[in-house]
């Protein structure tokens, strides 16, 4: 799996950073899952390696405008492309009415269904939000001025590496049988032999895990959600120097984001959602924010628009 940052600014766009959005490209299918959709997201998609037609799920963290104002326009555009299977939209209470109002007020009728899932109960009761045979999604309540939620996407463990030479040495002909064996299934061969796929596979390979936390001040629930994750994307609106503002506005500093990664035993941290006050021309720059976080959690990286990062 990999992610593409479509917007990395906090609150308002800047000349170099759009407001929040991130696309997750699944490794086991052609699907793309979108996390947040600030104003201008569809323009960012057009400039990126993402195809909007592949978006099947959208996860919204909270109802502030810099995370949702791009949704109605994106959905309207997707309607023109004839997405007949529909889109699943996960998010807070009020998201459905916001989208419905925006679309109906502009006399927009979509050519595909929207399937809404309100996440509050899933977060408060620690229930799985979505699951199939390859992935599961969990969410957790964050600490912001309005209800906000973090999301975790976890791949299930994958079969071990298939030993082709062993199969060939046992005179098992290549073909669909190899696929079944790789899945660890018991297979009846044309010559009457029964073989167990587990004998041909190495140990299971650990699935990848990705966590997205914004907007929030430091939160123990974010630490729990991120436990042993391969990649944590965490908001870092303020520098440590502006910690008082972070507590006032319930956003995170660089140190809070790094502390979350450290306490959760996350392998890699990428900080995003930077305040536009930090530019290369100001006394505190984005590079300074990165250095602050790296003092606490060395494997920290700085998000920028259109950055593509592997989960592992």
Curated annotation (Swiss-Prot):
<dbReference type="GO" id="GO:0008270">
    <property type="term" value="F:zinc ion binding"/>
</dbReference>
<dbReference type="Pfam" id="PF12706">
    <property type="entry name" value="Lactamase_B_2"/>
</dbReference>
<feature type="active site" description="Proton acceptor">
    <location>
        <position position="66"/>
    </location>
</feature>
<feature type="binding site">
    <location>
        <position position="62"/>
    </location>
    <ligand>
        <name>Zn(2+) 1</name>
    </ligand>
</feature>
<feature type="binding site">
    <location>
        <position position="144"/>
    </location>
    <ligand>
        <name>Zn(2+) 1</name>
    </ligand>
</feature>
<keyword id="KW-0378">Hydrolase</keyword>
<comment type="function">
    <text>Zinc phosphodiesterase, which displays some tRNA 3'-processing endonuclease activity. Probably involved in tRNA maturation, by removing a 3'-trailer from precursor tRNA.</text>
</comment>
<comment type="similarity">
    <text>Belongs to the RNase Z family.</text>
</comment>
<dbReference type="InterPro" id="IPR013471">
    <property type="entry name" value="RNase_Z/BN"/>
</dbReference>
<comment type="subunit">
    <text>Homodimer.</text>
</comment>
<keyword id="KW-0819">tRNA processing</keyword>
<keyword id="KW-0479">Metal-binding</keyword>
<feature type="binding site">
    <location>
        <position position="215"/>
    </location>
    <ligand>
        <name>Zn(2+) 2</name>
    </ligand>
</feature>
<dbReference type="GO" id="GO:0042781">
    <property type="term" value="F:3'-tRNA processing endoribonuclease activity"/>
</dbReference>
<feature type="binding site">
    <location>
        <position position="67"/>
    </location>
    <ligand>
        <name>Zn(2+) 2</name>
    </ligand>
</feature>
<feature type="binding site">
    <location>
        <position position="215"/>
    </location>
    <ligand>
        <name>Zn(2+) 1</name>
    </ligand>
</feature>
<keyword id="KW-0862">Zinc</keyword>
<protein>
    <recommendedName>
        <fullName>Ribonuclease Z</fullName>
        <ecNumber>3.1.26.11</ecNumber>
    </recommendedName>
</protein>
<keyword id="KW-0255">Endonuclease</keyword>
<dbReference type="InterPro" id="IPR001279">
    <property type="entry name" value="Metallo-B-lactamas"/>
</dbReference>
<feature type="binding site">
    <location>
        <position position="64"/>
    </location>
    <ligand>
        <name>Zn(2+) 1</name>
    </ligand>
</feature>
<dbReference type="InterPro" id="IPR036866">
    <property type="entry name" value="RibonucZ/Hydroxyglut_hydro"/>
</dbReference>
<feature type="binding site">
    <location>
        <position position="66"/>
    </location>
    <ligand>
        <name>Zn(2+) 2</name>
    </ligand>
</feature>
<keyword id="KW-0540">Nuclease</keyword>
<feature type="binding site">
    <location>
        <position position="273"/>
    </location>
    <ligand>
        <name>Zn(2+) 2</name>
    </ligand>
</feature>
